[in-house]
Protein backbone atom coordinates (compact mmCIF):
# COMPACT_ATOMS: atom_id res chain seq x y z
CA UNK A 1 0.00 0.00 0.00
CA UNK A 2 1.22 3.49 -0.87
CA UNK A 3 -0.27 5.10 2.23
CA UNK A 4 1.97 8.14 2.46
CA UNK A 5 1.55 8.81 -1.28
CA UNK A 6 -2.23 8.68 -0.83
CA UNK A 7 -2.06 11.06 2.11
CA UNK A 8 0.12 13.49 0.19
CA UNK A 9 -2.15 13.30 -2.85
CA UNK A 10 -5.20 14.06 -0.72
CA UNK A 11 -3.42 17.06 0.78
CA UNK A 12 -2.09 18.18 -2.61
CA UNK A 13 -5.60 18.25 -4.08
CA UNK A 14 -6.48 20.96 -1.55
CA UNK A 15 -3.52 23.09 -2.59
CA UNK A 16 -2.71 22.30 -6.24
CA UNK A 17 -5.31 21.90 -9.02
CA UNK A 18 -5.88 18.17 -9.39
CA UNK A 19 -3.11 17.56 -6.88
CA UNK A 20 -0.41 17.69 -9.55
CA UNK A 21 1.60 20.25 -11.50
CA UNK A 22 1.14 18.49 -14.86
CA UNK A 23 -2.17 16.73 -15.60
CA UNK A 24 -1.05 13.27 -16.75
CA UNK A 25 0.75 12.73 -13.42
CA UNK A 26 -2.62 12.44 -11.68
CA UNK A 27 -2.95 8.93 -13.21
CA UNK A 28 -6.62 9.49 -14.06
CA UNK A 29 -6.14 7.77 -17.41
CA UNK A 30 -5.32 4.50 -15.64
CA UNK A 31 -7.76 4.76 -12.73
CA UNK A 32 -4.97 5.10 -10.18
CA UNK A 33 -3.40 7.54 -7.77
CA UNK A 34 0.08 8.98 -8.33
CA UNK A 35 3.13 7.76 -6.51
CA UNK A 36 5.08 10.46 -4.68
CA UNK A 37 8.79 10.08 -5.25
CA UNK A 38 11.36 10.63 -2.52
CA UNK A 39 14.51 10.01 -4.55
CA UNK A 40 15.81 8.32 -7.69
CA UNK A 41 19.04 6.62 -8.72
CA UNK A 42 20.02 4.81 -11.90
CA UNK A 43 16.98 2.99 -13.26
CA UNK A 44 15.11 3.13 -9.94
CA UNK A 45 12.51 5.36 -8.34
CA UNK A 46 12.02 5.26 -4.57
CA UNK A 47 8.69 6.44 -3.16
CA UNK A 48 7.86 8.19 0.09
CA UNK A 49 6.49 4.82 1.27
CA UNK A 50 9.83 3.09 0.76
CA UNK A 51 8.72 1.26 -2.40
CA UNK A 52 11.17 0.78 -5.27
CA UNK A 53 10.20 0.80 -8.94
CA UNK A 54 12.10 0.16 -12.16
CA UNK A 55 11.45 3.37 -14.04
CA UNK A 56 10.39 3.25 -17.70
CA UNK A 57 9.13 6.85 -17.75
CA UNK A 58 12.42 8.66 -17.10
CA UNK A 59 10.73 11.90 -16.08
CA UNK A 60 9.01 11.78 -19.50
CA UNK A 61 12.30 11.57 -21.37
CA UNK A 62 15.14 13.64 -19.91
CA UNK A 63 16.87 10.86 -18.00
CA UNK A 64 18.50 8.95 -20.86
CA UNK A 65 21.56 8.43 -18.65
CA UNK A 66 19.40 7.30 -15.75
CA UNK A 67 18.81 9.20 -12.53
CA UNK A 68 21.58 10.93 -10.57
CA UNK A 69 24.35 10.08 -13.02
CA UNK A 70 27.55 10.90 -11.09
CA UNK A 71 29.02 13.20 -13.74
CA UNK A 72 25.80 15.16 -14.03
CA UNK A 73 25.21 15.52 -10.30
CA UNK A 74 28.84 16.54 -9.76
CA UNK A 75 28.45 19.27 -12.38
CA UNK A 76 25.26 20.55 -10.74
CA UNK A 77 26.79 20.52 -7.26
CA UNK A 78 29.74 22.54 -8.52
CA UNK A 79 27.44 24.99 -10.30
CA UNK A 80 25.31 25.57 -7.19
CA UNK A 81 28.36 26.80 -5.32
CA UNK A 82 28.94 29.38 -8.07
CA UNK A 83 25.39 30.76 -7.89
CA UNK A 84 21.96 29.63 -9.06
CA UNK A 85 21.04 32.53 -11.37
CA UNK A 86 22.84 35.59 -12.68
CA UNK A 87 20.47 37.30 -15.09
CA UNK A 88 23.56 37.78 -17.22
CA UNK A 89 25.53 35.63 -19.67
CA UNK A 90 27.74 32.83 -18.38
CA UNK A 91 30.42 30.73 -20.05
CA UNK A 92 28.44 27.51 -19.81
CA UNK A 93 25.76 28.95 -22.11
CA UNK A 94 28.36 29.23 -24.84
CA UNK A 95 29.76 25.77 -24.15
CA UNK A 96 26.35 24.07 -24.28
CA UNK A 97 25.33 26.03 -27.38
CA UNK A 98 28.49 24.85 -29.15
CA UNK A 99 27.74 21.23 -28.27
CA UNK A 100 24.20 21.50 -29.64
CA UNK A 101 25.37 23.19 -32.84
CA UNK A 102 28.08 20.57 -33.36
CA UNK A 103 25.63 17.69 -32.86
CA UNK A 104 22.57 18.74 -34.87
CA UNK A 105 22.86 19.15 -38.67
CA UNK A 106 20.05 21.72 -38.86
CA UNK A 107 21.30 24.05 -36.13
CA UNK A 108 23.77 26.87 -36.86
CA UNK A 109 22.69 28.98 -33.89
CA UNK A 110 20.63 28.19 -30.79
CA UNK A 111 18.73 30.18 -28.16
CA UNK A 112 18.23 28.69 -24.68
CA UNK A 113 14.84 28.92 -22.97
CA UNK A 114 13.23 27.17 -20.00
CA UNK A 115 10.87 24.51 -21.37
CA UNK A 116 9.83 22.67 -24.48
CA UNK A 117 6.63 24.72 -24.64
CA UNK A 118 8.66 27.93 -24.59
CA UNK A 119 10.88 26.55 -27.34
CA UNK A 120 8.01 25.66 -29.68
CA UNK A 121 6.06 28.88 -29.13
CA UNK A 122 9.23 30.89 -29.79
CA UNK A 123 10.06 28.87 -32.91
CA UNK A 124 6.56 29.47 -34.28
CA UNK A 125 6.81 33.21 -33.62
CA UNK A 126 10.16 33.25 -35.37
CA UNK A 127 8.78 31.33 -38.35
CA UNK A 128 5.91 33.78 -38.67
CA UNK A 129 8.22 36.76 -38.34
CA UNK A 130 10.66 35.38 -40.88
CA UNK A 131 8.07 34.41 -43.51
CA UNK A 132 5.52 37.15 -42.90
CA UNK A 133 2.82 34.46 -42.86
CA UNK A 134 0.46 33.28 -40.14
CA UNK A 135 -0.77 29.73 -40.72
CA UNK A 136 0.75 26.61 -39.17
CA UNK A 137 0.44 22.99 -40.25
CA UNK A 138 0.26 20.65 -37.26
CA UNK A 139 -0.50 16.94 -37.04
CA UNK A 140 -3.44 15.47 -35.16
CA UNK A 141 -2.26 13.84 -31.93
CA UNK A 142 1.15 15.48 -31.97
CA UNK A 143 1.95 17.48 -28.85
CA UNK A 144 4.12 20.58 -28.93
CA UNK A 145 3.52 21.94 -25.46
CA UNK A 146 0.58 23.91 -24.13
CA UNK A 147 0.91 27.21 -26.00
CA UNK A 148 -2.42 28.21 -27.54
CA UNK A 149 -1.68 27.51 -31.24
CA UNK A 150 -0.62 23.92 -30.51
CA UNK A 151 -3.63 22.76 -28.47
CA UNK A 152 -5.83 21.98 -31.46
CA UNK A 153 -6.19 18.16 -31.58
CA UNK A 154 -3.17 17.72 -29.32
CA UNK A 155 -1.77 14.50 -27.90
CA UNK A 156 -0.17 13.74 -24.50
CA UNK A 157 -2.31 14.83 -21.53
CA UNK A 158 -4.92 16.45 -23.77
CA UNK A 159 -5.54 13.06 -25.35
CA UNK A 160 -5.23 11.15 -22.07
CA UNK A 161 -7.91 13.26 -20.38
CA UNK A 162 -10.10 13.44 -23.53
CA UNK A 163 -10.34 17.23 -23.23
CA UNK A 164 -12.72 18.42 -25.98
CA UNK A 165 -11.75 21.33 -28.19
CA UNK A 166 -9.46 23.99 -26.78
CA UNK A 167 -11.14 25.63 -23.75
CA UNK A 168 -9.56 28.98 -22.96
CA UNK A 169 -8.03 29.32 -26.42
CA UNK A 170 -9.71 31.88 -28.71
CA UNK A 171 -11.12 30.45 -31.91
CA UNK A 172 -9.19 33.11 -33.79
CA UNK A 173 -5.94 31.60 -32.50
CA UNK A 174 -6.55 28.01 -33.56
CA UNK A 175 -8.10 29.14 -36.85
CA UNK A 176 -4.56 29.55 -38.15
CA UNK A 177 -3.63 26.00 -37.10
CA UNK A 178 -4.22 23.64 -40.02
CA UNK A 179 -4.52 19.96 -39.13
CA UNK A 180 -3.49 16.81 -40.97
CA UNK A 181 -3.18 13.17 -39.87
CA UNK A 182 0.37 12.15 -38.98
CA UNK A 183 2.07 10.18 -41.76
CA UNK A 184 -0.48 11.42 -44.34
CA UNK A 185 1.55 13.36 -46.89
CA UNK A 186 -1.39 13.65 -49.30
CA UNK A 187 -3.41 15.53 -46.67
CA UNK A 188 -0.54 17.99 -46.19
CA UNK A 189 -0.34 18.53 -49.95
CA UNK A 190 -4.05 19.35 -49.93
CA UNK A 191 -3.51 21.97 -47.21
CA UNK A 192 -0.74 23.59 -49.22
CA UNK A 193 -2.91 23.56 -52.33
CA UNK A 194 -5.51 25.60 -50.43
CA UNK A 195 -3.34 27.76 -48.17
CA UNK A 196 0.22 27.54 -49.49
CA UNK A 197 0.82 31.30 -49.67
CA UNK A 198 -0.27 31.75 -46.04
CA UNK A 199 1.56 28.83 -44.39
CA UNK A 200 4.52 29.94 -42.30
CA UNK A 201 5.62 26.51 -41.15
CA UNK A 202 5.00 22.84 -40.63
CA UNK A 203 5.75 21.67 -37.10
CA UNK A 204 6.15 17.94 -36.60
CA UNK A 205 7.38 15.46 -34.06
CA UNK A 206 9.87 13.72 -36.35
CA UNK A 207 9.02 10.61 -34.34
CA UNK A 208 5.64 11.03 -32.70
CA UNK A 209 5.87 10.34 -28.98
CA UNK A 210 2.69 11.82 -27.57
CA UNK A 211 0.07 9.61 -29.21
CA UNK A 212 2.15 6.71 -28.07
CA UNK A 213 5.26 6.05 -30.13
CA UNK A 214 4.56 6.32 -33.87
CA UNK A 215 7.56 6.37 -36.24
CA UNK A 216 7.37 8.27 -39.53
CA UNK A 217 6.58 6.27 -42.65
CA UNK A 218 9.23 6.08 -45.34
CA UNK A 219 9.11 9.26 -47.40
CA UNK A 220 6.92 11.23 -44.98
CA UNK A 221 9.58 13.56 -43.58
CA UNK A 222 11.22 13.86 -46.99
CA UNK A 223 7.86 14.90 -48.43
CA UNK A 224 7.39 17.57 -45.78
CA UNK A 225 10.82 18.96 -46.58
CA UNK A 226 9.96 19.12 -50.28
CA UNK A 227 6.62 20.84 -49.68
CA UNK A 228 8.21 23.50 -47.50
CA UNK A 229 10.88 24.14 -50.12
CA UNK A 230 8.28 24.40 -52.88
CA UNK A 231 6.06 26.85 -51.00
CA UNK A 232 8.58 28.94 -49.04
CA UNK A 233 7.44 27.63 -45.66
CA UNK A 234 9.74 26.57 -42.82
CA UNK A 235 10.03 23.00 -41.54
CA UNK A 236 10.18 22.81 -37.75
CA UNK A 237 11.27 19.55 -36.14
CA UNK A 238 10.04 19.24 -32.57
CA UNK A 239 12.90 17.22 -31.11
CA UNK A 240 12.04 17.83 -27.46
CA UNK A 241 11.74 14.05 -27.05
CA UNK A 242 13.90 12.77 -29.92
CA UNK A 243 16.81 15.18 -29.61
CA UNK A 244 19.91 13.26 -28.44
CA UNK A 245 17.72 10.15 -27.91
CA UNK A 246 17.05 8.51 -31.28
CA UNK A 247 20.66 9.30 -32.16
CA UNK A 248 23.19 11.74 -30.76
CA UNK A 249 22.27 14.08 -33.62
CA UNK A 250 18.56 13.57 -33.10
CA UNK A 251 15.92 12.50 -35.60
CA UNK A 252 17.34 14.87 -38.21
CA UNK A 253 20.62 12.99 -38.20
CA UNK A 254 18.96 9.59 -38.04
CA UNK A 255 16.65 10.23 -41.00
CA UNK A 256 18.93 12.56 -42.95
CA UNK A 257 16.38 15.39 -43.14
CA UNK A 258 17.52 18.90 -42.27
CA UNK A 259 14.79 21.15 -40.82
CA UNK A 260 14.86 24.94 -40.87
CA UNK A 261 14.19 25.15 -37.14
CA UNK A 262 14.57 22.63 -34.31
CA UNK A 263 13.07 22.68 -30.83
CA UNK A 264 14.75 20.91 -27.93
CA UNK A 265 14.23 20.23 -24.23
CA UNK A 266 14.34 17.37 -21.74
CA UNK A 267 17.72 15.65 -22.34
CA UNK A 268 19.70 18.86 -22.96
CA UNK A 269 19.05 19.90 -19.35
CA UNK A 270 19.92 16.60 -17.74
CA UNK A 271 16.70 16.70 -15.71
CA UNK A 272 16.67 20.42 -14.95
CA UNK A 273 14.14 22.82 -16.52
CA UNK A 274 15.37 23.75 -19.98
CA UNK A 275 14.40 24.22 -23.59
CA UNK A 276 16.06 25.53 -26.72
CA UNK A 277 15.30 26.39 -30.31
CA UNK A 278 17.80 26.66 -33.10
CA UNK A 279 18.17 26.63 -36.83
CA UNK A 280 19.70 28.20 -39.86
CA UNK A 281 21.81 31.27 -39.15
CA UNK A 282 19.85 33.61 -41.43
CA UNK A 283 16.62 32.69 -39.64
CA UNK A 284 17.99 32.76 -36.09
CA UNK A 285 19.50 36.21 -36.66
CA UNK A 286 15.96 37.58 -36.90
CA UNK A 287 15.61 37.14 -33.11
CA UNK A 288 16.10 40.18 -30.85
CA UNK A 289 18.48 41.80 -30.13
CA UNK A 290 19.95 41.30 -33.62
CA UNK A 291 16.53 41.09 -35.26
CA UNK A 292 12.95 42.24 -34.75
CA UNK A 293 11.33 38.99 -33.48
CA UNK A 294 11.16 39.29 -29.70
CA UNK A 295 11.75 36.54 -27.16
CA UNK A 296 13.24 36.79 -23.67
CA UNK A 297 13.46 34.96 -20.35
CA UNK A 298 14.73 35.77 -16.86
CA UNK A 299 16.08 32.28 -16.24
CA UNK A 300 17.03 31.38 -19.81
CA UNK A 301 20.52 29.91 -19.87
CA UNK A 302 20.57 29.56 -16.10
CA UNK A 303 23.87 28.13 -14.85
CA UNK A 304 22.47 25.00 -13.21
CA UNK A 305 20.68 23.73 -16.31
CA UNK A 306 23.64 24.64 -18.50
CA UNK A 307 26.04 22.69 -16.29
CA UNK A 308 23.74 19.66 -16.23
CA UNK A 309 23.30 19.85 -19.99
CA UNK A 310 27.03 20.02 -20.70
CA UNK A 311 27.73 17.02 -18.49
CA UNK A 312 24.85 15.04 -20.00
CA UNK A 313 25.92 15.65 -23.59
CA UNK A 314 29.54 14.87 -22.71
CA UNK A 315 28.53 11.44 -21.42
CA UNK A 316 26.11 10.79 -24.28
CA UNK A 317 28.77 11.66 -26.86
CA UNK A 318 30.70 8.57 -25.79
CA UNK A 319 27.69 6.30 -25.16
CA UNK A 320 26.77 3.19 -27.15
CA UNK A 321 23.50 4.18 -28.85
CA UNK A 322 23.58 1.21 -31.23
CA UNK A 323 24.06 -1.22 -28.37
CA UNK A 324 21.15 0.22 -26.39
CA UNK A 325 18.89 0.14 -29.43
CA UNK A 326 19.75 -3.50 -30.11
CA UNK A 327 18.99 -4.45 -26.50
CA UNK A 328 15.65 -2.62 -26.60
CA UNK A 329 14.67 -4.23 -29.91
CA UNK A 330 15.29 -7.72 -28.53
CA UNK A 331 13.47 -6.88 -25.31
CA UNK A 332 10.43 -5.48 -27.15
CA UNK A 333 10.24 -8.54 -29.41
CA UNK A 334 10.07 -10.80 -26.36
CA UNK A 335 7.58 -8.56 -24.56
CA UNK A 336 5.25 -8.58 -27.56
CA UNK A 337 5.45 -12.37 -27.78
CA UNK A 338 4.58 -12.69 -24.08
CA UNK A 339 1.54 -10.44 -24.37
CA UNK A 340 0.31 -12.04 -27.60
CA UNK A 341 0.52 -15.38 -25.83
CA UNK A 342 -2.16 -14.17 -23.45
CA UNK A 343 -4.71 -13.93 -26.22
CA UNK A 344 -5.06 -10.15 -26.27
CA UNK A 345 -4.65 -7.93 -29.32
CA UNK A 346 -1.28 -6.20 -29.07
CA UNK A 347 1.23 -4.33 -31.17
CA UNK A 348 4.37 -2.70 -29.83
CA UNK A 349 5.83 0.21 -31.76
CA UNK A 350 9.51 0.80 -31.06
CA UNK A 351 12.34 3.01 -32.24
CA UNK A 352 15.74 3.53 -30.64
CA UNK A 353 15.21 3.39 -26.84
CA UNK A 354 11.46 4.05 -26.89
CA UNK A 355 8.40 1.83 -27.22
CA UNK A 356 4.64 1.83 -26.71
CA UNK A 357 2.36 -1.13 -26.02
CA UNK A 358 -0.84 -0.71 -28.04
CA UNK A 359 -3.59 -3.20 -27.27
CA UNK A 360 -4.91 -3.48 -30.82
CA UNK A 361 -4.55 -5.81 -33.80
CA UNK A 362 -4.18 -2.93 -36.23
CA UNK A 363 -0.96 -1.17 -37.23
CA UNK A 364 -0.63 2.15 -35.39
CA UNK A 365 0.54 4.84 -37.79
CA UNK A 366 -1.38 7.93 -36.63
CA UNK A 367 -3.63 9.20 -33.86
CA UNK A 368 -6.79 7.63 -35.30
CA UNK A 369 -5.24 4.17 -35.26
CA UNK A 370 -3.69 4.82 -31.82
CA UNK A 371 -7.18 5.45 -30.48
CA UNK A 372 -8.31 1.99 -31.64
CA UNK A 373 -6.19 0.49 -28.87
CA UNK A 374 -8.12 -0.88 -25.89
CA UNK A 375 -7.70 1.58 -23.02
CA UNK A 376 -9.18 -0.82 -20.47
CA UNK A 377 -6.54 -3.43 -21.33
CA UNK A 378 -3.80 -0.83 -20.94
CA UNK A 379 -5.19 0.20 -17.55
CA UNK A 380 -5.17 -3.42 -16.39
CA UNK A 381 -1.64 -3.89 -17.71
CA UNK A 382 -0.45 -0.69 -16.02
CA UNK A 383 -1.94 -1.60 -12.64
CA UNK A 384 -0.58 -5.14 -12.62
CA UNK A 385 2.90 -4.03 -13.71
CA UNK A 386 2.96 -1.28 -11.10
CA UNK A 387 1.95 -3.78 -8.42
CA UNK A 388 5.09 -5.73 -9.37
CA UNK A 389 7.43 -2.74 -9.18
CA UNK A 390 7.41 -1.69 -12.84
CA UNK A 391 6.74 2.01 -13.38
CA UNK A 392 5.15 2.75 -16.77
CA UNK A 393 3.54 5.89 -18.16
CA UNK A 394 0.05 6.31 -16.66
CA UNK A 395 -1.40 6.84 -20.13
CA UNK A 396 -1.72 4.75 -23.29
CA UNK A 397 -0.73 7.83 -25.31
CA UNK A 398 2.85 8.13 -24.06
CA UNK A 399 6.07 6.36 -24.93
CA UNK A 400 7.99 4.13 -22.54
CA UNK A 401 11.68 4.94 -22.23
CA UNK A 402 14.75 2.78 -21.66
CA UNK A 403 17.91 4.46 -20.38
CA UNK A 404 21.59 3.61 -20.48
CA UNK A 405 21.21 2.85 -16.76
CA UNK A 406 18.77 -0.02 -17.36
CA UNK A 407 20.55 -3.34 -16.98
CA UNK A 408 19.71 -6.64 -18.61
CA UNK A 409 18.32 -7.68 -15.23
CA UNK A 410 15.98 -4.66 -15.27
CA UNK A 411 14.63 -5.64 -18.67
CA UNK A 412 14.31 -9.27 -17.56
CA UNK A 413 12.37 -8.12 -14.49
CA UNK A 414 9.85 -6.34 -16.69
CA UNK A 415 9.47 -9.42 -18.86
CA UNK A 416 8.95 -11.57 -15.77
CA UNK A 417 6.29 -9.14 -14.53
CA UNK A 418 4.56 -9.22 -17.92
CA UNK A 419 4.41 -13.03 -17.77
CA UNK A 420 2.39 -12.77 -14.55
CA UNK A 421 -0.17 -10.34 -15.97
CA UNK A 422 -3.67 -11.73 -16.55
CA UNK A 423 -6.44 -10.22 -18.65
UniProtKB/Swiss-Prot annotation:
Output the Gene Ontology cellular-component terms. cytoplasm
Q: Which gene encodes it?
A: hemL
Q: Which InterPro entries does this one have?
A: 4pyrrol_synth_GluAld_NH2Trfase, Aminotrans_3, Aminotrans_3_PPA_site, PyrdxlP-dep_Trfase, PyrdxlP-dep_Trfase_major, PyrdxlP-dep_Trfase_small
The keyword Protease is assigned to this record:
no
Q: Which residues form a coiled coil?
A: none
Highest taxon in the source lineage: Bacteria
Q: What is this protein called?
A: Glutamate-1-semialdehyde 2,1-aminomutase
Instruction: Name the Gene Ontology biological process terms.
Output: protoporphyrinogen IX biosynthetic process
Cofactors, names only: pyridoxal 5'-phosphate
Q: Reaction catalysed?
A: (S)-4-amino-5-oxopentanoate = 5-aminolevulinate
As one GO molecular function, the record gives: transaminase activity
Give residues where N6-(pyridoxal phosphate)lysine occurs: 266
Top-level enzyme category: isomerase
Origin organism lineage:
Bacteria, Pseudomonadati, Thermodesulfobacteriota, Desulfovibrionia, Desulfovibrionales
* Location relative to the cell: Cytoplasm
Pathway recorded for this protein:
Porphyrin-containing compound metabolism; protoporphyrin-IX biosynthesis; 5-aminolevulinate from L-glutamyl-tRNA(Glu): step 2/2
Q: How does it assemble?
A: Homodimer.
Give the Enzyme Commission number: 5.4.3.8
Amino acid sequence: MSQRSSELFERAQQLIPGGVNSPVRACLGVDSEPLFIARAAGSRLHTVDGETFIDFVESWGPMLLGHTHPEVTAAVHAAVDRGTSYGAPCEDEVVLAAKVVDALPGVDMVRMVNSGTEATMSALRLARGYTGRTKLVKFVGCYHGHADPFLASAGSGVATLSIPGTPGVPESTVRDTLLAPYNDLAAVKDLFALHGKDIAAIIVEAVAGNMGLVPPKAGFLEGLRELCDQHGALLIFDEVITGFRVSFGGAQQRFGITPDLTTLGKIIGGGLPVGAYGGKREIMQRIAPCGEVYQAGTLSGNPLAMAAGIATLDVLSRSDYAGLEARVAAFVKELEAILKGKGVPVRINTLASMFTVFFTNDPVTDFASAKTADGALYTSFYKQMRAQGIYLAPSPFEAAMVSFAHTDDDLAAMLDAARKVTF
